[in-house]
């Protein structure tokens, strides 16, 4: 199975999937459009979250970073008047240093991810969506800013006028992702932000055409008219997409076969059928590993 993932939502579902399926059977294609260089090192927030999940390092209270990490380097930089913007943990920073050194030596982002997976003892196949640089910028009332500046620096507060995924039309799907598509028929679109997490992956040239040839199941990150987490509630309207499960399904319509949405959502199942996909209700909140496992079982049965 191939799973498309961002840094929130989908990792919780992955937590359930790895409880019911051998990790070797999971290929996770991860968004890289939120990556940025900080203090000379490449930060890949979504990749790091997935790597830390599969290596049992993740801070499960925040669902990002490493559990019990320290912040000595960040605090020392701050004391010296250097503001990094992102509060990076010391052990987390080691991941970034290893990745960046591999890339500086001429290897790809995929190569660095495969190496980190090996160092962490991960059995799942974790891959960046592309080896080419792609960056999401948010057009706001306060100006245009990188997604991390919008979401972390500004806490997602500015009014959003548009979203620009820079470099995506020139980027290529990574060779190892294409290789995985040759072997797998089942694709899961996880419940991550459809605009800034899943959007960059499916916007890569040729990706939607590949998906049309596969069995695609998607899980909604929206309940009612609000996202479970993250800034999708502001980003979707700015892109002309309704903040609802229906809005998400319509965004995926050209390749979607099965759509799983929350049991508390009042959306009409038959409305999804009219889009050409089968609809299924489930508890999508994933408030515990057991809940994640229950949703994972429903999703696997949908294929």
Curated annotation (Swiss-Prot):
Cofactor(s) for this UniProt protein: Mg(2+)
Record has Magnesium as a keyword: yes
This protein's UniProt keywords: Magnesium, Transferase
Residues reported in the UniProt entry to bind 7,8-didemethyl-8-hydroxy-5-deazariboflavin: 48, 87
EC number annotated for this UniProt entry: 2.7.8.28
Annotated GO MF terms: LPPG:FO 2-phospho-L-lactate transferase activity; magnesium ion binding
Primary enzyme class: transferase
UniProt pathway annotation: Cofactor biosynthesis; coenzyme F420 biosynthesis
GO biological process: F420-0 metabolic process
Keyword Magnesium appears in the UniProt entry: yes
Subunit comment: Homodimer.
Protein name: 2-phospho-L-lactate transferase
Provenance organism: Methanosarcina mazei (strain ATCC BAA-159 / DSM 3647 / Goe1 / Go1 / JCM 11833 / OCM 88)
Lineage of source species: Archaea, Methanobacteriati, Methanobacteriota, Stenosarchaea group, Methanomicrobia
Gene: cofD
């Amino acid at each position: 199975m191939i799973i498309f993932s961002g840094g929130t939502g989908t990792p919780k579902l992955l937590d359930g999937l790895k409880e019911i399926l051998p990790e070797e059977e999971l290929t996770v294609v991860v968004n890289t459009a939120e990556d940025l260089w900080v203090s000379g090192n490449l930060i890949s927030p979504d990749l790091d979250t997935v790597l830390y999940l599969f290596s049992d390092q993740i801070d499960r209270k925040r669902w990002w970073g490493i559990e019990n990490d320290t912040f000595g380097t960040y605090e020392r930089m701050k004391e010296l008047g250097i503001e990094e913007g992102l509060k990076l943990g010391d052990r987390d920073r080691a991941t970034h240093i290893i990745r960046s050194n591999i890339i500086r030596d001429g290897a790809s982002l995929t190569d660095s991810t495969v190496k980190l997976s090996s160092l962490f003892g991960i059995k799942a196949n974790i891959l960046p969506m592309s080896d080419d640089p792609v960056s999401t910028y948010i057009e706001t009332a306060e100006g245009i800013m990188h997604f991390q500046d919008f979401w972390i620096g500004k806490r997602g507060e500015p009014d959003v006028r548009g979203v620009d995924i820079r470099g995506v039309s020139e980027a290529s799907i990574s060779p190892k992702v294409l290789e995985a598509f040759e072997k797998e028929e089942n694709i899961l679109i996880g419940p991550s932000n459809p605009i800034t997490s899943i959007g960059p992956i499916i916007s890569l040239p040729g990706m939607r055409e590949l998906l049309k040839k596969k069995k695609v199941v998607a899980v909604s990150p929206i309940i009612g008219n609000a996202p479970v987490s993250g800034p999708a509630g502001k980003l979707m309207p700015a892109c002309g997409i309704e903040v609802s499960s229906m809005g998400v399904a319509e965004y995926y319509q050209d390749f979607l076969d099965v759509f799983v949405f929350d049991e508390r959502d009042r959306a009409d199942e038959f409305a999804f059928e009219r889009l050409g996909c089968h609809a299924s209700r489930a508890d999508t909140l994933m408030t515990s590993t057991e809940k994640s496992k229950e949703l994972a079982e429903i999703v696997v049965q949908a294929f």
